[in-house]
Amino acid sequence: MVEDSRVRDALKGGDQKALPASLVPQAPPVLTSKDKITKRMIVVLAMASLETHKISSNGPGGDKYVLLNCDDHQGLLKKMGRDISEARPDITHQCLLTLLDSPINKAGKLQVYIQTSRGILIEVNPTVRIPRTFKRFSGLMVQLLHKLSIRSVNSEEKLLKVIKNPITDHLPTKCRKVTLSFDAPVIRVQDYIEKLDDDESICVFVGAMARGKDNFADEYVDEKVGLSNYPLSASVACSKFCHGAEDAWNIL
């Protein structure tokens, strides 16, 4: 707390003096799937509606694709015989903003993956800045799905990348895997996480779809849990798990 107050005092009033190295906030190491030991929380956004569709060919810039969504492509979805609930990439967008903005992510204790409804697995770098507007997010996802990775402008670091299935190959060696179900016993997240072993991580599969069965992760999970006596959106479910882990691990 003393160091925090000295940092604030140094910055107050536009002080341009360089801070001592010991006072400069240090970014935590970036977690990757290669790290099989560090205790953390992993969130897998399962059944995510991220699907592109070609809308023009042989244009000046080549073929043009869009990210299917229920607001802009109702007519197209109808022609394809698809329900509009199958085109909800906005759910994934909301979840990513919630997760990546969280203190647990800034503390370096969160990893995020996306499993699309088409079986594509995506690793999300904790430092990536997801666009706030859905239009820009859509453009980014189209680029990712066709180029298979998005690199940082300032380095060769990959911020988003398509990786090989199955998801279990990328999880820590000791990891409790759970998924959310409205029919499962309701838990208090903080209490649940505090009961994990000292070296045990937790992986939560969250359904990033408008509706559907909760069997999307049955082949992976150890247990199904409930978070509330009321139906929750995917974004709120992500938020509750983040807050619970932050409280359990004393992340402020």
Swiss-Prot record:
InterPro entries: Alpha/beta_knot_MTases, Rbsml_bgen_MeTrfase_EMG1/NEP1, tRNA_m1G_MTases_N. It is found in: Nucleus, Nucleolus. The record marks R88, R129, R132, R136 as: Interaction with substrate rRNA. It catalyses: pseudouridine(1191) in yeast 18S rRNA + S-adenosyl-L-methionine = N(1)-methylpseudouridine(1191) in yeast 18S rRNA + S-adenosyl-L-homocysteine + H(+). CDD domains: Nep1-like. The keyword Ribosomal protein does not apply. S-adenosyl-L-methionine-dependent pseudouridine N(1)-methyltransferase that methylates pseudouridine at position 1189 (Psi1189) in 18S rRNA. Involved the biosynthesis of the hypermodified N1-methyl-N3-(3-amino-3-carboxypropyl) pseudouridine (m1acp3-Psi) conserved in eukaryotic 18S rRNA. N1-methylation is independent on acp-modification at the N3-position of U1191. Also has an essential role in 40S ribosomal subunit biogenesis independent on its methyltransferase activity, facilitating the incorporation of ribosomal protein S19 (RPS19A/RPS19B) during the formation of pre-ribosomes. This is Ribosomal RNA small subunit methyltransferase NEP1. It comes from Saccharomyces cerevisiae (strain ATCC 204508 / S288c). The lineage of its organism: Eukaryota, Fungi, Dikarya, Ascomycota, Saccharomycotina.
